[in-house]
Amino acid sequence: MSSGANITYASRKRRKPVQKTVKPIPAEGIKSNPSKRHRDRLNTELDRLASLLPFPQDVINKLDKLSVLRLSVSYLRAKSFFDVALKSTPADRNGGQDQCRAQIRDWQDLQEGEFLLQALNGFVLVVTADALVFYASSTIQDYLGFQQSDVIHQSVYELIHTEDRAEFQRQLHWALNPDSAQGVDEAHGPPQAAVYYTPDQLPPENASFMERCFRCRLRCLLDNSSGFLAMNFQGRLKYLHGQNKKGKDGALLPPQLALFAIATPLQPPSILEIRTKNFIFRTKHKLDFTPIGCDAKGQLILGYTEVELCTRGSGYQFIHAADMLHCAESHIRMIKTGESGMTVFRLFAKHSRWRWVQSNARLIYRNGRPDYIIATQRPLTDEEGREHLQKRSTSLPFMFATGEAVLYEISSPFSPIMDPLPIRTKSNTSRKDWAPQSTPSKDSFHPSSLMSALIQQDESIYLCPPSSPAPLDSHFLMGSVSKCGSWQDSFAAAGSEAALKHEQIGHAQDVNLALSGGPSELFPDNKNNDLYNIMRNLGIDFEDIRSMQNEEFFRTDSTAAGEVDFKDIDITDEILTYVQDSLNNSTLMNSACQQQPVTQHLSCMLQERLQLEQQQQLQQPPPQALEPQQQLCQMVCPQQDLGPKHTQINGTFASWNPTPPVSFNCPQQELKHYQLFSSLQGTAQEFPYKPEVDSVPYTQNFAPCNQPLLPEHSKSVQLDFPGRDFEPSLHPTTSNLDFVSCLQVPENQSHGINSQSTMVSPQAYYAGAMSMYQCQPGPQRTPVDQTQYSSEIPGSQAFLSKVQSRGIFNETYSSDLSSIGHAAQTTGHLHHLAEARPLPDITPGGFL
């Protein structure tokens, strides 16, 4: 295998032949050059011969002289083969009486052949024994990018990878063993000499070992990654009749074997590729990319007629604004090198549709100078287009490569932020006189420039599907009368009388027109002239509008309306309030029949408590006698005007919005606020009380404990105790009640519990948050004995050790403590009104 320095592959770089014009014969006898007359006659015959070739006119126009002769010979050879193979009658060949019938049959065969080629996943290839392409179907262009006229009667080795040429030569031999002397010259392609066999030396045509199935890599112009496409060849060796070749001695040679195969891509195409592979179309452009022609497939895909396509002006009007600079770069490359390379961009089709295409443009020369451009486009799917767009964004620095440009979303060539302000001339006499700077318009750009093509495009083609609007468009392009009213409010605050009058003409669209324009000559129609005149009569100029724009841009309507700003909204408040309301609603529905007894019992309990307070007022000073009553009133009826209080539930800060509590009568004395945990050390959080029935959701961090309520009352005292790590109660519980109790010590003892202590009103404590349940006392209260504090009790020792060692904050409690050992002697127990639920007897994680 050669090093590949002199290896050449097939390409499509050929010059267009010179188009000769018929010159009139001079009237006088002017001498002419005989050689020139000979060349003119030869060119005339070649043009006539080229017109007889069965190829489209656009293919014929770019053929050179040698290609015309090559294709003419190939056509004659193919016709001779089919004459023998199809065994057509002389009458049909010479145009006998059945000429009309033959034309109908040929037309039907042609249509059937075209349909078969379109349905075939590949192309037909016939290669002779001397490695010349005898025939290639027109569908070769869909897979390799070569025209049918580019490969016919050319060496097949120019298409095959150098590493696969030996294998292809072996497959051409009938015994898979070509002569070793016939080596493939990798630099020039075909072998130096061909060996011809007689029919006696060749096997029958229908032999099984004449079948072929192999793979090799072919040169592909559509693949930019490697330049080759792996193809699978499947066919058989057959005799090529009708060639009438002669040997060196002049004797007629017998028909030789040739490879008839179908070449298919090794990787099967997807459904979308099968759908789009037959829609490759070509367009013809001037050197400035102005369209001057389009084939039938292009008209079918884009939806334009050739007249509509060629009368619009620059071809950049059909290109997406985000792809213009990318296509312009390929355009410049084509002018410099003659070929643009594969370029992926979006073309605007009819009915407001964008089509991704992969294009390759070539420069066609005439008389040694560039004449026009031929562009070959292949439609792509949207997924393929977006993939190419992502690859392009990594290599190109400007933002237009990513498709995110907003230049095409506004009417002005510049965005409102980038739009240059008119230069005003300040004067003491009038503020209406101003001299604007020259604003860009459609006429200020060159007709063939990119900006001119961009301005000529309709804005609506970029709004379907709607894209994200520019920041200023949401306020000014799509503004409403309500927003104009908000502008008026801002002007009133500034005290501008002229701005107050702006509401009459303050529509957002008019404001946008005023922003993008200048004096009256910039408004071509009468409507905009009237707008400009009204603005001048009201004393409003563009500087005022600019200041109004800036003020409106940084001011939101919600703030002006007095609404709460988003940053002031506590999401946790809303969540906890919703949970609380849901629990309250469900509880009220389940226990509606119990609401009336609850209120009555609470009222009775309060009245009894107040009677005790009146008795104790005779023995204690008024300030001290009034304090426990305030505590009880506060525990029964919490504050109703509390806002959202921040509390910590299970170690997490949250917000809690209390709902209105159940009301009851307390005519004896005015209820006052009681602040539990009023002196916290290291924290400033407040704990609202929850008097609603079953207002606190069920939690695992809850230990039920039931204690009776005793009437005795003593002075309050402050006690330092830890906020965590309480041990569970050692005393037995009597029911599944959702209450807990808290022990108090009298004021005259610093490290012990008073023998006069009783139990305070039951309260539920949750890991930093506290709620109050409404309680029902029994029909009567039975006094019980009081239990003295004993140091031998293990529960008391453990409790006091924690109190002494881990004091976190001070808290004021009532000194009413009940006997722990006589809890079962009470006649009525406090209980929760909601449905009883079994709770696990575990150590709580919070306060007890």
From Swiss-Prot:
Subcellular location: Cytoplasm; Nucleus
Effect after changing residue 821 to D: In allele AHRB3
Consequence recorded when altering residue 112 to A: Reduces transcription activity. Decreases interaction with ARNT
Bias (Polar residues): 436-449
Domain PAS: 116-179, 269-336
Consequence of changing residue 43 to A: Reduces the binding affinity of AHR?ARNT to the DRE by more than 10-fold
Region: Disordered, residue numbers: 1-38, 421-449
Effect recorded for residue 49 to E: Reduces the AHR induction transcription activity by 50%. Increases ligand-induced nuclear translocation of AHR
Span(s) of short sequence motif Nuclear localization signal 1: 12-15
Ranges where the record places region DNA-binding: 37-65
Region (Required for maintaining the overall integrity of the AHR:ARNT heterodimer and its transcriptional activity): 49-81, 116-124, 260-262
Induction note: Induced or repressed by TGF-beta and dioxin in a cell-type specific fashion. Repressed by cAMP, retinoic acid, and TPA.
Propeptide intervals in chain numbering: 1-9
Name listed for the protein in its UniProt record: Aryl hydrocarbon receptor
Annotated organism of origin: Mus musculus
